[in-house]
């Protein structure tokens, strides 16, 4: 793919064919995906975008956490789900996927773009198993 715009097009096509599809991106990439996000939400395709939310900058060198990238997608029709820690990211990622499938609504699952995305922490898998049962 040349950019995240192409990746969003690939996700859209994959979802249309019935595959369970997700992608992971950060601030500038998310803004390039917005045109395809309108299509996915309008077609009620159950995709999930995991977003490492960072401040938008002229270059891609910003390490400051900010939600302006995610807030730019509010009007697309995607449901938003926010996490504040590594355990929450693990648990609510599964919730986002299950909710997208059950409700036929695409989700943006977002968290802090520098602290949480680079944090190393032991997680409890049994918490995620509760959601799957």
Regions found by a protein language model. Give the residues of each.
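Metal-ion/cofactor- or nucleotide/acyl-coenzyme-handling active-site neighborhoods
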Residues: 70-74, 121-124
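Thiamine diphosphate
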Residues: 1-72, 78-101
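Conformationally flexible catalytic loops at phosphate/diphosphate-handling active centers
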Residues: 107-133
């Amino acid at each position: 793919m040349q950019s995240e715009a192409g990746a969003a097009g690939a996700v859209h096509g994959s979802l249309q064919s019935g595959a369970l599809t997700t992608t992971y991106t950060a601030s500038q990439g998310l803004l390039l995906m917005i045109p395809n996000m309108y299509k996915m939400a309008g077609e009620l395709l159950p995709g999930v975008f995991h977003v490492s939310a960072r401040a938008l900058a002229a270059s891609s060198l910003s390490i400051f956490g900010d939600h302006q990238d995610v807030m730019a997608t509010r009007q697309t029709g995607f449901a938003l789900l926010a996490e504040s820690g590594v355990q929450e990211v693990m648990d609510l990622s599964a919730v986002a996927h299950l909710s997208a499938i059950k409700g036929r609504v695409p989700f943006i699952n977002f968290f802090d773009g520098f602290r949480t995305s680079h944090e190393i922490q032991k997680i409890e898998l049994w918490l995620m198993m509760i959601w799957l049962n």
